[in-house]
């Protein structure tokens, strides 16, 4: 993947403004609420019976923070995301058997939460385009083991 200077700047700039400890839990909770079939991968997380239960679930919040830690690794390795994510791809494919379409759903929820947080002034069309390109590269890297 080729990144322009403007794309790198937009991605790194947005990341610098995000609070991963806030956005990660929000995005994962949103994914579990909007796409309830994704809950099947989180059977050990306890009560996921309602939106309020999901939003207040500490295991959901912790895994949301873990997801954001993974995105931070991708940002620090933007020129080598596939290699950076190779172990995660193997784990999600071979051990956890996660449907790879769910990565795109979660990426979309991350984008929605970021857009809601920053609005059109902080999440304009150029930032959104770069951010979604970045997340699509991350999703592709996570799906690599599935091909």
Swiss-Prot record:
Entry function: Involved in oxygen transport from gills to the various peripheral tissues.
Pfam families according to UniProt: Globin
PROSITE patterns: GLOBIN
Transmembrane segments: none
GO CC annotation terms, alphabetical: blood microparticle; haptoglobin-hemoglobin complex; hemoglobin complex
Tissue-wise expression: Red blood cells.
Database matches in InterPro entries: Globin, Globin-like_sf, Globin/Proto, Hemoglobin_b, Hemoglobin_oxygen_transport
Annotated ranges, domain Globin: 2-147
Coiled-coil boundaries: none
Positions with a binding annotation for heme b: 63, 92
The protein, known as: Hemoglobin subunit beta
One Gene Ontology MF term: oxygen binding
Superkingdom of source: Eukaryota
Family: Belongs to the globin family.
Keyword list, A-Z: Heme, Iron, Metal-binding, Oxygen transport, Transport
GO biological process: hydrogen peroxide catabolic process
Subunit structure: Heterotetramer of two alpha chains and two beta chains.
């Amino acid at each position: 993947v080729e990144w322009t200077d403007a794309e790198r700047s937009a991605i790194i700039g947005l990341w610098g403004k995000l609070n991963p400890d806030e956005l990660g839990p929000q995005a994962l909770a949103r994914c579990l609420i909007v796409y309830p079939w994704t809950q099947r991968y989180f059977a050990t997380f306890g009560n996921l019976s309602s939106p309020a239960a999901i939003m207040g679930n500490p295991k959901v919040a912790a895994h949301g923070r873990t997801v954001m830690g993974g995105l931070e690794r991708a940002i620090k390795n933007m020129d080598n995301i596939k290699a950076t994510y190779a172990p995660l791809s193997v784990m999600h494919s071979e051990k956890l058997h996660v449907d790879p379409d769910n990565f795109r759903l979660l990426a979309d929820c991350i984008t929605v939460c970021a857009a809601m947080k920053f609005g059109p002034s902080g999440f304009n069309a150029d930032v959104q385009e770069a951010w979604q390109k970045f997340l699509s590269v991350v999703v592709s890297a996570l799906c690599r083991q599935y091909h």
